[in-house]
């Protein structure tokens, strides 16, 4: 299956699951293919045949954007270089959760999150340690008795009851012994932080020198500006005094390629519940494109009042619907 067909299939699946899905980010640079929202769950999805194609820089950008937009970065893919991704298992690449399409269907359509995650050494599950302790005590078993049944040490059983994760083999043994599942679902839509072994969110990239003057003006106007490296927009700007607070921010000469980015920003903004603004090097005869505000750098330079800048963006940029 081609990557384009895979993206179309995943998009259709999400729409069937009542997600609002953005237009595909068919521009470069980019770190994700589509944004999708259902209620308060916002996902930034990268869709790949081979998930090993996700490099460290893209993974870092996805995690930063997830933090800026209050979204979950996620990869849906088919295989690694060595094997097919297993259904019902969460993998990780550069701190980003990775699942296959079958797992995605179970999660998004059926509402069944995966129970298993991959980590160095094999496949693991999160155990409900309190439930395990209750069941063991109700049966009148000591730590030693359960340790003998499992073929592990008393210390290991004690750690399981304190919340240590277990191999899938141990989880199956426990279920067979007690006729009770002890596995806790992996909260993929919250980033799987409880099982993800990753560094803190990577620091922001350096601002492109070509964009410094625009982002500097926004900073002086009271925005908190987060530069991006691999997105259809140059920054995510936050204005805590507005609703919505976040503004997808672009800047360049307004070429046909830039107009395409502006339209994609509008689509992403509708899903992510942000406004979007594109700062142009020349004056344009339009004030917006598909809801993305167009503001020339000359106009920006003529406004000395920070509130005037915020008002201009609010007036020209379409506010996203809450649907």
UniProtKB/Swiss-Prot annotation:
- Show the Pfam families listed in the entry: HTH_3 (PF01381)
What CDD domains does the record point to? HTH_XRE (cd00093)
Residues making up the signal peptide according to the UniProt record: none
Disordered: where is this region? 188-211
Q: Which Gene3D superfamilies match?
A: lambda repressor-like DNA-binding domains
User: Which residues are in the HTH cro/C1-type domain?
Assistant: 132-189
Could you tell me which residues form the DNA-binding region? 143-162
Q: Name one GO molecular function term.
A: DNA-binding transcription factor activity
Q: Which UniProt keywords apply?
A: DNA-binding, Transcription, Transcription regulation
| InterPro entries linked | Arc_TR_HTH, Cro/C1-type_HTH, Lambda_DNA-bd_dom_sf
List the HAMAP family hit by this protein, alphabetically. HTH_type_cro_C1 (MF_00584)
**What is the name of the protein in this document?**
Putative HTH-type transcriptional regulatory protein Hlac_0273
